[in-house]
Amino acid sequence: MKIAVLSRNPRLYSTRRLVEAGVERGHEMVVIDTLRAYMNIASHKPQIHYRGKPLEGFDAVIPRIGASVTFYGCAVLRQFEMMGVFPLNESVAIARSRDKLRSLQLLSRRGIGLPVTGFAHSPDDIPDLIDMVNGAPLVIKVLEGTQGIGVVLCETATAAESVIEAFMGLKQNIMVQEYIKEAGGADIRCFVVGDKVIAAMKRQAKPGEFRSNLHRGGSASLIKITPEERMTALRAAKVMGLSVAGVDILRSNHGPLVMEVNSSPGLEGIETTTGKNVAGIIIEHLEKNGGPNMTRTKGKG
């Protein structure tokens, strides 16, 4: 197969590993800088050009689209779909998962366990919003934040009111969530490929920190997940429409709670921690399911 990898940086661990795994399995792998691809949106012959030449003959595309380039990245991926190229994850599913509020609304509709979450626009509603999530301590999250940036733990209602007012004053969209104390600053990253959780790791926040992101100095270790956690991760990925996803789960007193469904999960942490060839499993999934004109979104967007 001829497989495109949409990535800003060919030297990133995840991009490198996907290329290596594809080449090992006999595929032609081409890394394309997402922001340098440009489109000809013609009625009968949609095209993507790159460095002055049309991109042709691709069977599949692996999107590694960073959060900051979601809009343009999804447009490029959608153009590949219009050309009949099979996407590992579809543009519509990636756009859906990048909107944290929309994601939680979709997951809640399907009865998937979530932390109690509130969202409001007016400062007048802040006291009621805090009560809605069972009061302080609580967590405030900027909707556009990634890697733990823009996430604040407020120990008291007074502190929470001040922080929420400040964010609202800056015209930032935020959501307020109950703090799951029993999770102890740890979460579980379940790596979903197709209809299987192929790997899982526990991420533990460093002392004095509650955010378990590895980018924030958290540590990763092997973990055995329960059947309920496995089912929750698979259902969450399916609701979002993602074939490959990193589903972040908290262990609470009332079962597993989904924090986030990541459409472009990093490979370094999960491969290093579990010793699994995750990149190879992803390429294998593409071989079984992909091929020209097999995209489900063609014509739907």
UniProtKB/Swiss-Prot annotation:
<feature type="binding site">
    <location>
        <position position="260"/>
    </location>
    <ligand>
        <name>Mn(2+) 1</name>
    </ligand>
</feature>
<feature type="binding site">
    <location>
        <position position="262"/>
    </location>
    <ligand>
        <name>Mn(2+) 2</name>
    </ligand>
</feature>
<feature type="binding site">
    <location>
        <position position="260"/>
    </location>
    <ligand>
        <name>Mg(2+) 1</name>
    </ligand>
</feature>
<dbReference type="InterPro" id="IPR023533">
    <property type="entry name" value="RimK"/>
</dbReference>
<keyword id="KW-0436">Ligase</keyword>
<dbReference type="InterPro" id="IPR004666">
    <property type="entry name" value="Rp_bS6_RimK/Lys_biosynth_LsyX"/>
</dbReference>
<dbReference type="GO" id="GO:0005737">
    <property type="term" value="C:cytoplasm"/>
</dbReference>
<dbReference type="InterPro" id="IPR041107">
    <property type="entry name" value="Rimk_N"/>
</dbReference>
<feature type="binding site">
    <location>
        <begin position="211"/>
        <end position="213"/>
    </location>
    <ligand>
        <name>ATP</name>
    </ligand>
</feature>
<comment type="similarity">
    <text>Belongs to the RimK family.</text>
</comment>
<dbReference type="GO" id="GO:0006412">
    <property type="term" value="P:translation"/>
</dbReference>
<feature type="binding site">
    <location>
        <position position="260"/>
    </location>
    <ligand>
        <name>Mn(2+) 2</name>
    </ligand>
</feature>
<keyword id="KW-0460">Magnesium</keyword>
<feature type="binding site">
    <location>
        <position position="260"/>
    </location>
    <ligand>
        <name>Mg(2+) 2</name>
    </ligand>
</feature>
<keyword id="KW-0648">Protein biosynthesis</keyword>
<feature type="binding site">
    <location>
        <position position="248"/>
    </location>
    <ligand>
        <name>Mg(2+) 1</name>
    </ligand>
</feature>
<dbReference type="Pfam" id="PF08443">
    <property type="entry name" value="RimK"/>
</dbReference>
<dbReference type="GO" id="GO:0046872">
    <property type="term" value="F:metal ion binding"/>
</dbReference>
<feature type="binding site">
    <location>
        <position position="248"/>
    </location>
    <ligand>
        <name>Mn(2+) 1</name>
    </ligand>
</feature>
<dbReference type="Pfam" id="PF18030">
    <property type="entry name" value="Rimk_N"/>
</dbReference>
<keyword id="KW-0547">Nucleotide-binding</keyword>
<dbReference type="GO" id="GO:0018169">
    <property type="term" value="F:ribosomal S6-glutamic acid ligase activity"/>
</dbReference>
<keyword id="KW-0464">Manganese</keyword>
<dbReference type="InterPro" id="IPR011761">
    <property type="entry name" value="ATP-grasp"/>
</dbReference>
<dbReference type="InterPro" id="IPR013815">
    <property type="entry name" value="ATP_grasp_subdomain_1"/>
</dbReference>
<feature type="binding site">
    <location>
        <position position="187"/>
    </location>
    <ligand>
        <name>ATP</name>
    </ligand>
</feature>
<dbReference type="GO" id="GO:0009432">
    <property type="term" value="P:SOS response"/>
</dbReference>
<protein>
    <recommendedName>
        <fullName>Probable alpha-L-glutamate ligase</fullName>
        <ecNumber>6.3.2.-</ecNumber>
    </recommendedName>
</protein>
<keyword id="KW-0067">ATP-binding</keyword>
<feature type="binding site">
    <location>
        <position position="141"/>
    </location>
    <ligand>
        <name>ATP</name>
    </ligand>
</feature>
<dbReference type="InterPro" id="IPR013651">
    <property type="entry name" value="ATP-grasp_RimK-type"/>
</dbReference>
<feature type="domain" description="ATP-grasp">
    <location>
        <begin position="104"/>
        <end position="287"/>
    </location>
</feature>
<feature type="binding site">
    <location>
        <position position="262"/>
    </location>
    <ligand>
        <name>Mg(2+) 2</name>
    </ligand>
</feature>
<keyword id="KW-0479">Metal-binding</keyword>
<dbReference type="GO" id="GO:0005524">
    <property type="term" value="F:ATP binding"/>
</dbReference>
<dbReference type="GO" id="GO:0036211">
    <property type="term" value="P:protein modification process"/>
</dbReference>
<feature type="binding site">
    <location>
        <begin position="178"/>
        <end position="179"/>
    </location>
    <ligand>
        <name>ATP</name>
    </ligand>
</feature>
